[in-house]
Amino acid sequence: MAVISMKQLLEAGVHFGHQTRRWNPKMKRYIFTERNGIYIIDLQKTVKKVEEAYNFIKQVSEDGGKVLFVGTKKQAQDSVKAEAERAGQFYVNQRWLGGILTNYKTISKRIKRISEIEKMEEDGLFEVLPKKEVVELKKEYDRLIKFLGGIRDMKSMPQALFVVDPRKERNAIAEARKLHIPIVGIVDTNCDPDEIDYVIPANDDAIRAVKLLTGKMADAILEGQQGVSNEEVAAEQNIDLDESKEATEAETTEENTSVESN
């Protein structure tokens, strides 16, 4: 069974590309035709590419890896946050701050500041500090949460990046490529597919299209996690069986010893 159907893609408007005058020739192999000055994406290829991306992301998840979702354009912000949280992953849905991947040591200090301000409030310091200072601290906290809240629990580099619109997220892609982190991306007809390891040719401007495809990547992660959970359960069951076997053997030995002594 296919990961995604042609009907789902059509209903979400995934097939609508950009105007023919705004295109990247490298996307030619993913274009089906042109209609009223708009390129139409070949959805048969999209179905295949979604499946390839899905299987890759699922494997990353099965291996215990994490995926960083990146989508800072308005059409992607809500879906990126919601689907990343649903799958228990990291996300950046506001401005990409330079160094999130390549200078994480500095970024992590700013993330630490979030916890520091939270502790100040928990300890009651906000009640004794001057009102003006408290207002400034709250502004600082809101700003940090806005830009770094989605990666505050990211203690190490992600094993994959999922991006919506490579043109918009070129800084994130540059950092990921520098660190050899595989990239999955929703790539429209005006983008360069060569920058992406797992290309999903699709409309990156329609909210429904972005939501559908981002949701599929979250589904892949959850399916991969289910595989990990099943393996853990099986391992625990094997341990229980081994312990049960050892206990049974011990009981048998005791019974034999008792019989022999009698």
Swiss-Prot record:
Keyword Protein transport included in the entry's annotation: no
Entry's Gene Ontology cellular component terms: cytosolic small ribosomal subunit
InterPro entries: Ribosomal_uS2, Ribosomal_uS2_bac/mit/plastid, Ribosomal_uS2_CS, Ribosomal_uS2_flav_dom_sf
A biological-process GO annotation: translation
Keywords, in A-Z order: Ribonucleoprotein, Ribosomal protein
Region (Disordered): 228-262
Presence of keyword Coiled coil: no
Sample GO molecular function, one term: structural constituent of ribosome
HAMAP family, alphabetized: Ribosomal_uS2_B (MF_00291_B)
Recorded family membership: Belongs to the universal ribosomal protein uS2 family.
Protein name, as recorded: Small ribosomal subunit protein uS2
Native organism: Staphylococcus saprophyticus subsp. saprophyticus (strain ATCC 15305 / DSM 20229 / NCIMB 8711 / NCTC 7292 / S-41)
Higher taxonomy: Bacteria, Bacillati, Bacillota, Bacilli, Bacillales
